[in-house]
A protein has these predicted regions:
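Sec/Tat signal peptide C-region and signal peptidase I cleavage site
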Residues: 26-32
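Low-complexity, intrinsically disordered terminal/linker segments enriched in charged
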Residues: 159-195
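Surface-exposed, polar/charged faces of alpha-helical domains
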Residues: 49, 53, 57, 82-87, ...
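N-terminal secretory signal peptides that target proteins for export/translocation
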Residues: 1-9
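Bacterial N-terminal signal peptides
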Residues: 14-25
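Short beta-strand edge/turn micro-motifs at domain boundaries
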Residues: 141-169
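Surface-exposed, charged secondary-structure patches
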Residues: 101-142, 192-195
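Early exported N-terminus immediately downstream of N-terminal targeting peptides
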Residues: 33-107
Length: 195
């Protein structure tokens, strides 16, 4: 994990992702009849418990349970997607989820959330978007838009937008750069994620 998160440029993207993940620590308002908003409330409750515990394992579990993990894993490989051996996919995917959980657990104390609001949802071209507003203890306020994919009768979190920037491209850039720095060897990323 340290090898992936070592440069300041890489940390910027992951910090932005962290702000999005940490958005759901203290609920203030929920549109009760909206299933997408109700889903995000469940995510919020579990993130609150995991965040308070400061446990990478609990945060990893929340990402695994509510994230669109298959999509995220595929997208994060970017131009190297076709080079991942089928036998390496399970290790890579679970390693990616653990990476997100560990990094979030490390960074969570830096972004103390005072409260948040889940505002509403809207159907978009690529999924359902749930809008929220995050209030940090220092008075900073962030608007975060969550992108959900519908899976049967439930949803999965696919992305989050902070300051008009979607977060998954930051993870993709991080992973692609790591692979490129290791001679284009996808197995190097798999190895660091499965440690």
């Amino acid at each position: 994990m340290h090898a992936l998160a070592s440069s300041p440029r890489r940390l910027t993207g992951l910090v932005a992702c962290l702000v999005a993940v940490m958005a759901f620590l203290h609920p203030t308002r929920v549109a009760a009849a909206d299933p997408a908003v109700q889903f995000m409330q469940r995510v919020a409750n579990e993130l609150l418990i995991a965040s308070r515990s400061k446990s990478p394992e609990l945060l990893t579990s929340v990402v695994q349970r509510y994230g669109d993990v298959g999509y995220l894993a595929n997208y994060a490989l970017g131009s190297y997607r076709g080079q991942l051996a089928p036998a390496d996919r399970p290790g890579y995917t679970s390693g990616m989820v653990r990476f997100i959980g560990r990094y979030t657990a490390q960074q969570a104390p830096k972004y103390p959330v005072a409260k948040y609001e889940i505002l509403s949802s809207v159907q978009g071209g690529s999924g359902i978007m749930v809008d929220s507003r995050i209030h940090l203890r220092d008075g900073t306020v962030y608007e975060v838009r969550w992108l959900l994919a519908k899976y049967g009768s439930t949803y999965r979190v696919r992305d989050a937008m902070v300051y008009a920037f979607w977060m998954t491209p930051f993870l993709k850039t991080l992973f692609e750069n790591y692979i490129a720095e290791n001679g284009g060897n996808v197995k190097a990323l798999v190895a660091v994620l499965t440690r």
